[in-house]
Amino acid sequence: MLASLHLLNRYVKVDDQDPVELAEKITRIGLEVEGQGPLAKGTKLVVGYVKECIEHPNSDHLHICQVETAPGEVRQIVCGAPNVAAGEKVIVALPGCELEGGKISSGSIRGEQSDGMICSIAELGLDNRLLKEEDKAGIHVLPEDAPVGTEALSYLGLDDYILDIGLTPNRADCMAMQSLAYEAAAVLGRKVTLPEVKKYPEEKSEIEVHVETPLCSFFGAKLVKGVTTKESPKWMQNALLASGIKPINNIVDISNFVMVETGQPIHMYDYDKLVKKAFVIKTGFNQKAVLLDENEYDILPEDVIVSTDDGIGCVAGVMGGNDTKIDDNTKNIVIEAATFDGAALRNTARRMNLLTDASQHYIKGAIDTMSSLKVLDRCTDLLVQYADATTIYETVHTPLDETRKTVTIELSRVNGLLGTSLTVKEVSDIFDSLCFEYTLEDELFTVTVPT
């Protein structure tokens, strides 16, 4: 699991911690950090302003640029990018900057002095598979109000640090950044602050949900109308990049971000592409279907399917169907949050060779069903904020068992399992730091499993 410290800092203050020391503390509590490092690679990167750009006299593709890299400080840089032009704010690697491709130095390029390099996003060491095509094709042009001389990675929000955490099977809950935040808060002696989720007036829903297989223990669907498809905010795009997920658009990005934040996979359907406005979760299909990646797959009777209009709306927990996908013209959507059987999904995902981020959450048991309704509300709130959603409908869902589970354990059992000599107060302090609800009678703890 890739954990962004910038994202973690949204829930618990960690930006005053040395990342290496924080990684050691997290490892000591049983969450092994297997790798770590900065999100983007590069030192001495600043925001520059291209004051002048002319053609290189000895080249048919190079340009000679006069670039202001600090107030009143102009340097000449030779650049071969086709989209460089006067008046642009750009990312400049100063001499001495170390990028993945090597160290930048001053020198002569076809007889003209060049003191630095104007960069693309791709040259900053980000995973090329997660970048947009325009970020690979030429230099990255910054907004006009980008302050000249500012540290570029900080300005872009890419000065992040990533922990690669190897989660054992019993800690699948930490696939949710909010759960990881509680662990970090406990080890640092701090409090977690979760985002406030705004509730909106709701109209009676126009959709139906029917579950016809025991392999789906919960299914919730929420209709939201009036959305606009556009770019998601930069902070959200950066959070997804840091989590190893490619940003697509605000609708898709919100669904992926909510999964990263809460651990609950989200799928969205274009409501206007549905005829019957009903979702039937069942098995028994034996046909071919084109999914979101535009490839055709064999659907077998044992596969759990979210059926729409008697067809394949989604291979449950794995990938959505192509017929109901979100596109640039989408105005009305249905949000799905569900709990599917992990073993059944594992067989389907492996056969299709589609071990997606969503399927991994189901397979590893990261789903907290009791939080599913809250997750739908979180998703809705983000759609209002960043997709201009106008009309919200009631959530339609199958019965939800909200009985909280409890675990009873004696202090002697705790110490016997851990090989420790903890006192009642020490164990109580640990439960308090993790925000666990519990009762204590003599040395017997009854702990309510968190949700």
What are these regions (language model features)?
Residues 19, 33-39, 191-200, 247-252, ...:
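Flexible, glycine/charged-enriched surface loops at secondary-structure junctions
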Residues 47-76, 255-323:
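Conserved mixed alpha/beta core segments that line enzyme active sites in large multi-domain catalysts
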Residues 40-46, 197-205, 254-261, 274-275, ...:
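A glycine-rich phosphate-binding loop feature that marks nucleotide/adenosyl-phosphate handling sites
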Residues 122-123, 129, 141-142, 229, ...:
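Conserved catalytic alpha/beta cores of large enzymes that bind or transform nucleotide phosphates
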Residues 184-213, 387-414, 418-421:
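Terminal amphipathic helices with adjacent charged low-complexity linkers/tails
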Residues 399-451:
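Noncatalytic alpha-helical scaffolds and linker/capping helices
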Residues 1-198, 334, 350-355, 366-369, ...:
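Phosphate-backbone binding interfaces of nucleic-acid-interacting proteins
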Residues 5, 24, 63, 188, ...:
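Glycine/proline-enriched, intrinsically flexible loops and inter-domain linkers
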